Amino acid sequence: MAHTFILESGQWTIEGNWLERNGMLITVKGKTIVTWDRTDWFSMVTKLIFPSQDREDIILQYRGRLDSDERHYTFLLQHSELGKIEGEGWLGINSIIQRYWVLGNDVQRRSGFETLLRLDQERYYFTGGILSGVSLNSAMEATIERQPD
């Protein structure tokens, strides 16, 4: 069973929880749109909203390239809170793992990681976190579900 997230164009919904350091769990919802414009380049746009909180939405705009081995990819990301980001991802048998780091003069040395565990062809379980140096600042866990075309 091949991965469908990232590797196929489509729309996905996100529902889960966000946790800030020293904060309570808050509900997060969102949507991701993945498109492929050439055989090895993809674009992905994600919008996360926090319906029960007075917190700004998070917008993520990716541009990535799948390596010739079709098991690794690299990406550039514009993150509405963190700025310009560079990252890499690995496509495992049952999961997609990626890490990223903030570009430029980032005195906080922010970086992050994400894992998407495939539940079935239409659903993934997402976990990820954002770090400053070696300290975890926030984490998110959510179910990502493909929407019909």
Positions of the model-derived regions?
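N-terminal helix-cap/turn-to-beta initiation motif at the start of protein domains
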Residues: 1-11
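Edge beta-strand at a domain terminus
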Residues: 113-149
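Charge-rich amphipathic alpha-helical interaction elements
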Residues: 2, 20, 88, 118-121, ...
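Central antiparallel beta-sheet cores of small beta-barrel/beta-sandwich binding domains
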Residues: 14-15, 19-112, 147
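Well-ordered beta-strand positions
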Residues: 6, 35-36, 90, 117-119
